[in-house]
Amino acid sequence: MAKVDTSHRLAELRKLMKERNVDIYTYISGFTGSAGYAVITHDKAALSTDGRYFNQAEKQLDSNWELLKQGIQDVPTIQEWTADQAEGGKVVGVDPSVVTAGDARKLAEKIKKKGGEYKAIDENLVDLVWSSERPARPSEKVIVQPERYACKGFEDKIDDLRKELEKKKSLGFVVSMLDEVAWLFNLRGSDIPYNPVFFSYAVVTPTAATLYVDENKLPEDVKEHLGNKITIRPYEAIFGDVTALSKELFEASDKNETQKKFLTSNRASWALNKALGGDDKVEETRSPVGDSKAVKNEVELEGMRQCHIRDGAALSEYFAWLEDQLINKKATLDEVDGADKLEEIRKKHDMFMGLSFDTISSTGANAAVIHYKPEKGECATIDPKAIYLCDSGAQYRDGTTDTTRTLHFTEPTEMERKAYTLVLKGNMALERVKFPKGTTGFALDALARQFLWAEGLDYRHGTGHGVGSFLNVHEGPIGIGTRVQYSEVSLAVGNVVSDEPGYYEDGKFGIRIENMVMVKEVETKHKFGDKPYLGFEHVTMTPHCRNLVDMSLLTEDEKKFINEYHKEVYEKTSKYFENDALTLEWLKRETAPY
């Protein structure tokens, strides 16, 4: 994970800023984490990121950059930092297509208070700096997600959306999130690595539905699937079309009624908001498509169960192989060797479509980098005497997986065992909770942290994220954590979410245990307030590392819960190892009763 020299890029960007009378611009960096926001002035550069990436950012950013650690006391937010730089009439520029309308409004207000100006620049200056180095946009074909996996036809999904538009008295809805477009039309793509989506927009009104996509990406079976019910328009036509459509529908609307508006997701871009006519003509809301997508139907839930059984078998085969290579064969393997072997094993299983994210194969101190990505030639050799953390997942035609297991192949330290067991206890506590309908992931987060907190320990990431069905491995709007958004959406039957507490000591080791769980209705002796009560069903089928468990910290009830889980893991995955004695013996050992 080498530092990236950004001096030339920054110099080129600052030259473009000067030509366009822009004093401050967002964003460019040499940072590869999935969550970061960068701001460049004529003499400064700052990157803001959350606790998952502090360690990674410190390793990757060169001396040109100031790192703003989100959530740390006395560290300004990136908005505050930007507004401070704008003091005295400075102009802050941004490509409006890469910032949400809501974020743009908030930042514009802060900048205005400091006497500055927030300005949309329709050409992306970062792209101009990137120029010929920028990879070509993918041209892979779109595929149909058959109803045997999706259950519900796209016509029915569009009808449901129109009912929501009618309730809200809206002129139409612009679908701007790629996974929402894919889900709505029962289509999948491969334009974004690991995410089966394709570059697209969609516009649905009470009488029409239009898909904006490069038509060359649509083979005949996709066109037949869509039929004559859907209009296909070029991807680049979206902004011009919605401007014209918005004007036409507003002019045709009844002037005696309350003025109807276009509906957009609260994650839609400022550029889309502007194209529709601005705040006066747009109502931002949590996406009704995203809400529907997050509630899986029974076919999708069964697909998630089945793909996690296959994926669990792949992980057990990999962990058995890795232990044998390191301990018995004394092999020298680096972190990428491990990740490559795991992918090779996964590929053998039915309906495998690819990985769902870069495999985090990390040994020792690298395991403390929460979203670590090993690179060949730069990564570490796997040390059998150190913690090994593997966070990985796959895309299958019937579902998406994401599992983290932390292992030790020799003799862990007392602290490693204690930390692992505290994390495991938190993982189980969350999975076993029962809660009334209407409870949010924000309210449940502390359950996973309680045993760490009791020791004065914690972790700097959320406890859970939603997961798609052969879609994005990180899916909103639900999640479990302390983010404000997780306090706004209740967990519902059919949601699939991760349960992944952890603990990390920079420069030493990292621990994370992640199971995928599904929200279901549960029986309780009473139903206070006449509300249904909900709980979780685990679908991950991979053993915990018994070598890292401090049995003295577990209650008898917790041991019973683990034993029942391991019995289920063995019963559901052992059939894959009838001709694989090595993995079968490993699985028997790891799932033996505590």
UniProtKB/Swiss-Prot annotation:
Keywords: Aminopeptidase, Hydrolase, Manganese, Metal-binding, Metalloprotease, Protease
Keyword Cytoplasm: no
Taxonomic superkingdom: Eukaryota
Catalytic function, reaction form: Release of any N-terminal amino acid, including proline, that is linked to proline, even from a dipeptide or tripeptide
GO-annotated cellular components: cytoplasm
Cofactor: binding comment: Binds 2 manganese ions per subunit.
GO MF annotations in UniProt: metal ion binding; metalloaminopeptidase activity
CDD domains: APP (cd01085)
InterPro entries, per database record: Creatin/AminoP/Spt16_N (IPR029149), Creatinase/aminopeptidase-like (IPR036005), Creatinase_N (IPR000587), Pept_M24 (IPR000994), Pept_M24B (IPR033740), Peptidase_M24_C (IPR032416), Peptidase_M24B_aminopep-P_CS (IPR001131), X-Pro_aminopeptidase_P (IPR050422)
EC number: 3.4.11.9
Cofactor(s) in the UniProt record: Mn(2+)
Binding-site list for Mn(2+) 2: 391, 402, 514
GO biological process: proteolysis
Stored Pfam families: Creatinase_N, Creatinase_N_2, Peptidase_M24, Peptidase_M24_C
Family, similarity comment: Belongs to the peptidase M24B family.
Protein name: Probable Xaa-Pro aminopeptidase P
